[in-house]
Amino acid sequence: MLYGFTWDTGNGELAFAISILPMLLMGLITTLQAAFLGFFVACVLGMVFAVLRGMRTRWVAWPAAVLIEFIRDTPLIAQLFFLYYVLPEYGIIFPAFLTGALALGIQYSAYISEVYRGGIQAVDHGQREAAKSLDLPPARTFTHVILPQAIPRVIPALGNYLVSIMKDVPVLSVVTIVEMLNAAKIIGDQTFNYLVPLSMVGGIYLILTIVASALVRIVDVNLPKRGVPLR
């Protein structure tokens, strides 16, 4: 028994699998929460990086490029340890779950920023010229002309990164977060049966990946690709 759960270890593998399912589902909820929060942070921070990286002012664009490269070239676990162990030394303390989600978001923001930048650069330059001829300010041109056409182009890539974030959530177990894989390990440690819980986690991840990929394809097919009319 652990965390209020009891496991049936004496009536066969099926009974054991059914008895551990509630704890794995609790781990699944934690996994999804961390993944979606991390994805949200990555999308927002990635857009900030993309805008800064695309500026013509070198003293803004170059530091942004260096920071993006630094984030991409350092391991997720190193960034996680920095947030969890180093920041508290300076009085900056976050709960373990939030720390994990932030680490995921920061790591993937560097990749997503390049996805955004590619989508923005793919928009026909004539769209910018047309907005300029209408005397639209740069900020409104970006939010009303460029982004509505750039975002639909990058939906498939964003979906792929969401799936990748889900599969990276188990790294957060090093800061005591009991996500799905860590829950399976705990069950295995207590029952000496690792095959069943780990196999179940693998199956759940497979289902998650298939469902997420299908949803991304549906959104990509049904999302308008030509943006929205100017107002």
From Swiss-Prot:
GO terms for biological process: amino acid transport. NCBIfam families: ectoine_ehuD, HEQRo_perm_3TM. It comes from Sinorhizobium fredii (strain NBRC 101917 / NGR234). The chain crosses the membrane at residues 9-29, 32-52, 64-84, 86-106, 161-181, 196-216. It is found in: Cell inner membrane. The keyword 4Fe-4S does not apply. This is Probable amino-acid ABC transporter permease protein y4tG. The keyword Transcription regulation does not apply. One of its GO terms (molecular function) is transmembrane transporter activity. Probably part of the binding-protein-dependent transport system y4tEFGH for an amino acid. Probably responsible for the translocation of the substrate across the membrane. GO terms for cellular component: ATP-binding cassette (ABC) transporter complex. Belongs to the binding-protein-dependent transport system permease family. HisMQ subfamily. Residues 28-217 form the ABC transmembrane type-1 domain. It is a multi-pass membrane protein.
